[in-house]
Amino acid sequence: MNTENGVATFFAENRYAAMYPHILAVPQPTLHVMKRLRAAGIRVRVEPSDQRPLCFTFQRGIGDWLADPAIVLLASIPVNIVSNIVFSWWQERKRRDREFPSATVAFVVEEDGDTRYYSLDGEPMSRQETHEISQRAQRSAKVFYRSINTPAPDPRRRYPIQRDHSGTIVGWAAGLRHSEKSLDLVDVFVSDPIAEADIASGKLAGVSVGAIAQRSTCSICLSNYVACDHIAGDDYSNGRCVVRIERALPAEFSFVQDPINPETKILR
């Protein structure tokens, strides 16, 4: 079916807007869906549409993360068309741990003044499912807003550290040191005695970090990762795509029990 006049619209969802209000960003899983549709010939746009460069939020060292949903507003494109493009590819990425288990995709169609949500397989979503997915991104942004607006007890350590992304602050850090193999929270003060004991016992074994990628490069075409159609973790004729994040704005830190990357460390 011809989709030349149709468009898939994504709305910027910067969960770290409270710290970086002028950054236009989408979550990394959302960017992947955008790339998949673009590569299939679907016209894609991001709202608000202005002169700011598009960035993406990302997380590293995280075992369990409630990812913000990728919500796609479809205009003049049948739901089954985009579902066929995305469904099997997305399920395979999740099976291979290329996406967070909680990452979700929903399609939205406005018909006769009524807004209808459809799941990844193209089936209508229930009212409860619709409410949950439409509120999820707002909730994560509110949790982050509360955490960064908590006054730091020491101005040298201005980054709050949560426990398991719960919104509860249990410590503070001066900053982040990162390399290709590790993520280290630097000059950490643990303010919560329970968290302190759990770190000492190994129950809280590592750190997860959320940030905004301002500059990134695709390993396949060596161009701007946001603008190209290659997707990190997918295989192409000349290899597997890897995104190289060259400039990032640190935003969110959390002590976690089961970090994906065992090299994430807490430096006291």
Please provide the spans of the model-predicted regions:
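Signature of dsDNA virion morphogenesis modules
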Residues: 132-268
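Short amphipathic alpha-helical segments that predominantly mediate membrane engagement
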Residues: 1-71, 87-141
